[in-house]
From Swiss-Prot:
Lineage start: Bacteria, Pseudomonadati, Pseudomonadota, Gammaproteobacteria, Pseudomonadales
Nucleotide-binding is among the record's keywords: yes
Record region (G3): 63-66
Pfam families: KH_2 (PF07650), MMR_HSR1 (PF01926)
Region (G1): 16-23
UniProt-recorded name of the protein: GTPase Era
Positions of the KH type-2 domain: 199-283
Organism superkingdom: Bacteria
Disulfide bonds: none
Keywords per UniProt: Cell inner membrane, Cell membrane, Cytoplasm, GTP-binding, Membrane, Nucleotide-binding, Ribosome biogenesis, RNA-binding, rRNA-binding
Mode of membrane association: Peripheral membrane protein
Region (G2): 42-46
Listed NCBIfam families: era (TIGR00436), PRK00089.1 (NF000908), small_GTP (TIGR00231)
Subunit details: Monomer.
């Protein structure tokens, strides 16, 4: 076999309900933090590529928003449409499910998978938390009945358990072909996008259930000056009360958000970062398709 014929390359969609561990799985496969994570469902809002090149194999993972039943706002419709679109024209699908729990939103994903032509791998997450692995068998058997042609792999996205098996199965299902991206490229997203996502992650982690989903981040300025990367980020909310929550008493909360986001950016960009944050009220942005488009929520 020639060197050209030994190359494998393809797209791998990572799908599942919200908050099941898709972004954590991508980060562990890549060996670095790329996709933002939090305990809040629907943290991921956009499809994002995570590219892993290892020898002759280039796997292009597509991290997707969690498919969910809520469809009442333009933002929810955008996320569901984005996740569904990822199932088209990919070479492999990884369906991430919980080790025991099955919900209506898992079923929603399963229903979409009936139309997928390519191979499906079912990654059963948090399997390492069960002391007696026999408890897992009924769930694995049920999953095998639902997806009889799928390979089922118990994993831990957080701790990396059995991910080598999952990656090996992915590699064996990718088509032969030249690599689409340079060996050292790990994503298709810009540095501005990654910076905005880091700020949004810190907001979601700081506020937990205090703040609804109507918050987004826009990078207004991003430039390197000497050894320092200067970033100006605008945090958009829908109501004055939400603005006060983010700022916090005497500005303490937004200060913590800024400190944590800056630290993450310095690791990601390997540069000293000067980060400035502002909070602005933009009423109704999450249910305004034109506003969403202007904020970067565009169809793939």
């Amino acid at each position: 076999m020639t060197e050209e014929n030994s190359l494998r390359c393809g797209y791998v969609a990572i799908v599942g309900r919200p908050n099941v561990g898709k972004s954590t799985l991508l980060n562990h496969i890549l060996g670095q933090k790329l996709a933002i994570t939090s305990r809040k469902p629907q943290t991921t809002r956009h499809n994002m590529l995570g590219i892993k090149t290892e020898g002759d194999v280039q796997a292009i993972y597509v991290d997707t928003p969690g498919l969910h039943k809520q469809n009442d706002k333009a933002l929810n419709r955008y996320m569901n449409k984005t996740a569904s679109a990822a199932l088209k024209d990919v070479d492999v699908v990884i369906f991430v499910v919980d080790r025991m729990r099955w919900t209506e939103e898992d079923q929603l994903v399963l229903d979409r998978l009936q139309y997928v032509q390519g191979p499906v791998l079912v990654a059963v997450n948090k399997a390492d938390r069960l002391e007696d692995k026999v408890e897992l068998l009924p769930h694995l058997q049920w999953l095998a009945q639902q997806l009889p042609n799928a390979e089922i792999v118990p994993i831990s996205a957080l701790h990396g358990h059995n991910l080598d098996t999952l990656e090996r199965l992915v590699a064996g299902r990718l088509p032969q072909g030249e690599h689409f991206f340079p060996e050292d490229q790990i994503t298709d997203r810009s540095s501005r996008f990654l910076a905005a996502e880091l700020v949004r992650e810190k907001i979601m982690r700081q506020l937990g259930a205090e703040l609804p989903y109507q918050v987004t981040v826009e990078i207004e300025d991003f430039k390197q000056q000497g050894q320092v990367l200067h970033i100006h980020a605008l945090i958009l909310v829908e109501r004055e009360g939400q603005k006060k929550i983010i700022i916090g008493e005497k500005g303490e909360r937004i200060k913590r958000i800024g400190q944590e986001a800056r630290q993450g950016m310095e690791v990601l960009f390997d540069s000293k970062v000067m980060l400035n944050l502002w909070v602005k009220v933009k009423g109704g942005w999450s249910d305004d398709e034109r506003a969403l488009h202007s904020l970067g929520y565009r169809d793939s």
